[in-house]
């Protein structure tokens, strides 16, 4: 996981990881579901490039599917569209399978798709938290410095935003 040389921290693949980091944190700070999905789409673009350059094709493919599903979920809540993205993630996972590590991004993608199409607000973010845990493990094992940092910060940021949404909903009831 740790770089052999300091220059590895500033390599092209890692720079894309840091861009994903910035947009990922911005994503999970959003209380608006629409802004959440837009930031997530931009994060996914950076992740596709990051993982492709790191040589982790299942994570790159999963991020590409996540990009498509993030954009689609802005316009649609259709179970058929969700099923398409879940099926696509599974097909890509089978096609690019290289071992157990390959399953983590695919599972995270399926969970994220379910969250984005079938839930909103706190429930959507709670399910995204499960996917975040899978990405933490994937990124550690893949050697993604920016990705690991991102997911750990997202874990914290998402919990904080869930707390803020919960606090806001309680204050509107009183």
Region annotations inferred by a language model:
Residues 1-174:
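Alpha-helical membrane-protein topology signature
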């Amino acid at each position: 996981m740790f770089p052999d040389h300091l220059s590895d921290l500033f390599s092209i693949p890692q720079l894309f990881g840091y861009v994903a980091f910035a947009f990922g944190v911005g994503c999970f700070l959003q209380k608006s579901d629409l802004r959440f999905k837009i930031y997530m789409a931009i994060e996914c673009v950076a992740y596709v490039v990051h993982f492709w350059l790191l040589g982790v094709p299942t994570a790159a493919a999963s991020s590409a599917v996540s990009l498509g599903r993030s954009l689609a979920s802005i316009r649609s809540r259709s179970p058929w569209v969700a099923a398409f993205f879940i099926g696509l993630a599974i097909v890509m996972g089978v096609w690019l399978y290289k071992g157990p590590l390959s399953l983590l991004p695919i599972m995270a993608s399926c969970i994220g798709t379910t969250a984005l199409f079938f839930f909103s607000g706190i429930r959507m973010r709670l399910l995204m938290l499960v996917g975040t845990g899978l990405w933490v493990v994937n990124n550690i094992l893949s050697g993604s410095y920016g990705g690991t940092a991102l997911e750990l910060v997202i874990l914290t940021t998402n919990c904080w935003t869930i707390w803020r949404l919960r606090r806001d909903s309680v204050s509107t009831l009183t």
